Amino acid sequence: MKGFSFKDENGKIYYEWWIVLTAAVVTGFVYSGIVSATGAFMLPVTQDLGLSVAAYSLYLTIMSLTSILTLVIVSKHMDRKNIKKLMITAGIIGIISFAGFALAQNLWMFYIFAVPQGFCFAAMTMTPCQLLVSNWFGEKAKGRAISIFLAGMQLIFILELNVLTAVIGRFSWRAGYMMVAVFIVIALLFVIKFVKWSPEDKGIKRIGDPDVAERAAALPAVEQGVEFSMAIRKPVTWFVLISCCLAVVASSAILQHGIPTMVVAGFTPAQATAVTSALSLVAVLIGPFVGWVCDRKLSVGAVCSAFCFALSTVGLSMLSVSKSAVVMYGVFWILGVATVNIVSPLLMSYMYGEKAMPRLLGYVNIFIGIGGAFGAAGLGALYEKFGSYQTPWLIATAALLIVTLVRAYSTAPKRKYDPEKN
């Protein structure tokens, strides 16, 4: 196996790591700019234009639904010939969408420009980046590589969020949206320079592949696996897809309602933001460890991360009783957040190999998009119904316990893809 290292014997950085860096930059600036940084804009935009928070937030649902439709159409075209073209096109469209946001004078402009933003989100960010990293790393290094890529994404997001907060505070929310467009330009430069479909395009062997003595095979590693038509007919595939959706229902709810939950519990907005930033930084350090666990025993990483994520929502529920529950929330969120973006793509590779990964990852991210479209809005509706966050977070806990059971079922040894048997 080509060793898990950053430089070759000549001291040059392996090209695989430029792929990881590119994925981190693209998702850190673009994915996070579209989804994770929305909180920085919400109050400035709604107060300046006199919009309700609910009406303004609807653009996120429009964006998510557009991204789902986009993935249905383009996932089958994410291949060696088209992936770079798709990412560049999506980046240009994303720049246009944020320029439109910066010029918005009414609610409908946000709704209109949310459509091209959804195309950018689907065709440039998580799906193609996960696919590229998956292509460039073999089964013995894939989990660590994805976790390092996501750790880099988180660090870049923290930088982006602080820059946006400063720009919005000093200038305006319009300048903030233009800053996101600038970040997309930076991401595009990385795509143009570094994106290659697989190590075969560079004539090199990828990190993490077994040696010939470990696994003799006639086909290259990136071509081994179950046909998509067979994989999609298996019930376990749909169980996994539903688990991806439920995990993101909870994740998107935490993203939008985690800080408000802490504020309602008695934290100041500044304290709640500081807690969130601190957790994100610690998660950067924990992510590679979770990836290491998944490389060695995916069932342990998948089940434990999902269960910890469930316990984090219990902590959020208990904040209505005691502020000290923030410790429970924080500890288990750090250990559990990997269940969304680290574990989800590994499940399909574990069960079916890599031949159908472009389309399977497309389906994974379609279901992630469905969860993202309705998670935050659903929890907000439950909050209005019950008058507090306690019961809504317990409902999220129940959903994550289902995720835990599905991941235990799908990572059983008998479901692991074996090229000699399959």
Where do the PLM segments sit?
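Extracytoplasmic gate region of multi-pass secondary transporters
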Residues: 34-45, 229-288
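A late C-terminal transmembrane helix in Major Facilitator Superfamily
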Residues: 148, 157, 351-386
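Extracytoplasmic
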Residues: 18-53, 71, 161, 254-259
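Helix-to-loop junctions at the C-terminal end of transmembrane segments
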Residues: 70-82, 287-298, 383-384
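Intracellular juxtamembrane helix-capping segments at the cytosolic ends
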Residues: 123-137, 339-352
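Conserved MFS/SLC helix-loop-helix module at the cytosolic interface between two early adjacent transmembrane helices
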Residues: 69-107
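Hydrophobic core of transmembrane alpha-helices in multi-pass small-molecule transporters
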Residues: 28, 109-124, 325-339
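C-terminal transmembrane helical hairpin of 12-TM major facilitator-type secondary transporters
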Residues: 277-287, 296-347
